[in-house]
């Protein structure tokens, strides 16, 4: 993980999504709906719902949109049955790609994902072909701006809260947890007075692939095409995006 700021990748993804705010709100509403339908509409007793509500608020999603999605999931009207489906494959230059979808029509989604890969120099693979290249982790990002704490003290508080490790960048402290400990670590750090620029359970690449030229352009187009699809919730990849800062 050293030398590759996951938070930088998240910022780039959020900036891209901000330009497509309506589509982002629709995807967040779907995620809220599924979380509420699965675990109930009370965020206090449903950690998954609580987390996605926080994510929605961070994206400036209106409260009425959030409440509407919860009411739709917990009401008596006919429900939409969304199923989580994951696709794995390779982008240009052998970049590993995982695509997480929520869909009510697997045939439509599979076709769209397959076309996105084939049109942008990639290949859709079998389940498990790249997932072993990622680790599922909780990631809590604390912005350093205006924060009066040094790296050693921050690390001590993170470890005492139950975190696995912490990385320090120029802009942030990036705290990693197991998925199981994520909620507990988050709550403890909140009790300690910290707020988060980002808080999510995500897939962290074990290694990164560097691209340039046409391969890089095609890979970025593949990511954009997948993220534009209404059924796609997340696109994880191991492209070294630090080159985009140069």
UniProtKB/Swiss-Prot annotation:
It is found in: Cytoplasm. GO terms for biological process: regulation of DNA-templated transcription. Pfam families: TACO1_YebC_N (PF20772), Transcrip_reg (PF01709). It comes from the Bacteria. Coiled coil: none annotated. Its main location: cytoplasm. InterPro entries: Integrase-like_N (IPR017856), TACO1_YebC-like_2nd/3rd_dom (IPR048300), TACO1_YebC_N (IPR049083), Transcrip_reg_TACO1-like (IPR002876), Transcrip_reg_TACO1-like_dom3 (IPR026564), YebC-like (IPR029072). GO terms for cellular component: cytosol. The keyword Transcription regulation applies. GO terms for molecular function: DNA binding. Gene3D superfamilies: 1.10.10.200, 3.30.70.980. Keywords: Cytoplasm, DNA-binding, Transcription, Transcription regulation. The keyword Transcription applies. Belongs to the TACO1 family. This is Probable transcriptional regulatory protein GWCH70_2524. It comes from Geobacillus sp. (strain WCH70).
């Amino acid at each position: 993980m050293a030398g590759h700021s996951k938070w930088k990748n998240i910022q780039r993804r959020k900036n891209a999504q901000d330009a497509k705010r309506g589509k982002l709100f629709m995807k967040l509403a779907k995620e809220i709906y599924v979380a509420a339908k699965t675990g109930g509409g009370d965020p206090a007793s449903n950690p998954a719902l609580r987390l996605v509500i926080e994510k929605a608020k961070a994206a400036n999603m209106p409260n009425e949109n959030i409440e509407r999605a919860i009411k739709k999931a917990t009401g008596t009207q006919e429900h939409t049955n969304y199923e989580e489906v994951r696709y794995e494959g390779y982008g240009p230059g052998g970049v590993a790609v995982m695509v997480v979808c929520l869909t009510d029509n697997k045939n439509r989604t599979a076709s769209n994902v397959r076309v996105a890969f084939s049109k942008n120099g990639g290949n859709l693979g079998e389940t498990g072909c790249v997932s072993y290249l990622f680790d599922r982790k909780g990631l809590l990002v604390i912005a350093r701006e205006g924060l009066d704490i040094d790296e050693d003290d921050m690390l001590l508080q993170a470890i005492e809260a139950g975190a696995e490790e912490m990385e320090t960048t120029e802009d942030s402290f990036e705290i990693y947890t197991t998925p199981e400990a994520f909620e507990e670590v988050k709550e403890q750090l909140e009790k300690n007075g910290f707020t988060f620029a980002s808080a999510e359970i995500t897939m962290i690449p074990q290694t990164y692939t560097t691209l340039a030229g046409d391969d890089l352009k095609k890979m970025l187009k593949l990511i954009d095409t997948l993220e534009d699809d209404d059924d796609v919730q997340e696109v994880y990849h191991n492209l070294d995006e630090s080159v985009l800062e140069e």
